[in-house]
Amino acid sequence: MKIKSFIYLIFAIPAFNLFCQAPELLWTKSLGGSESEVGFDVIGTADGGFLTVGYSSSTDGDIEFNAGGIDMFIVKFSSSNEVMFSKTFGGSDDDQSLSAVEAYNGGFIVGGWSTTSDGIIPGNYGLSDAIVLKTDVFGNLEWIKNYGGSNIDGIRSIIRTDDTSYLFTGTSHSNDIDITDHIGPEDKSDIIVGKIDLSGNLVWLNSYGSVGDDYSNQIIKTKDSCYLICGYRKLDFEDYYILKINGDGDLIWEKTFGGSAEDVAYGIDELSSGNIIVCGVSLSEDGDVGYVSGIADNWVILLDSAGNLLWERSYG
């Protein structure tokens, strides 16, 4: 029987050989069963190990339990690359984890989405809810919370804040219950950002976007204690969509970049200079995109702290 598994690859890149040879493969490890296991996020942990999150649909092999559909799948590795725990969480429908961070009070915070309203899932407001769960250091569930409305909602990225809270970003079609400021029509998605306290209680939740579809992929904290979110906006075509908010969720600025085809931002970071680097994929050959060598290229843009474009490069 074919096994579809998480696969872990670790590379060593000696600085003095950076341009001389391919990275050296140190080790690989796979975990899974006879169905599908997929990883979406990996974080380093304070003990020198790391944690991965994704989903599992297996009931055999390395997977001890499946509640139904796909379950959240969380694996903790030690500093010596040994599995410390492997856990699945969910109900009778689909549950998926997409992002994780170490908790302030020990253990781990994991965000994702769920279409389940039974098992360990505390009800479901609509078609899918944004989900955050907290485990202890051994992977035992401490609490799980759902957020959203009566339509489709989910979390894509979650981080820690400066005031021992957590901030998540994701996508929503809802305009009720926790989400009451939907911007576009019901069939269009907004970016959402929510703040929760140490116990998962919702502090605030805001929507950002346009009359089209808006999606987020990553959120980061900036040196001035604000937050940057990257993703894409789809009106006629997808464009990079970058926005900056303050600690209360107020919009500081928002920018779009791209051309007349699909351009989607997946990663964002703030440099020591205060400039902002964004990367993703571009299929455009016009507008802000100077050159594409193939059907799709890795498109990197550099912005100043106010979101103005400084330069762009395509690689591929």
Q: How should these model regions be labeled?
A:
Residues 19-316:
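A sequence-level/structural motif corresponding to short, flexible coil/turn segments enriched
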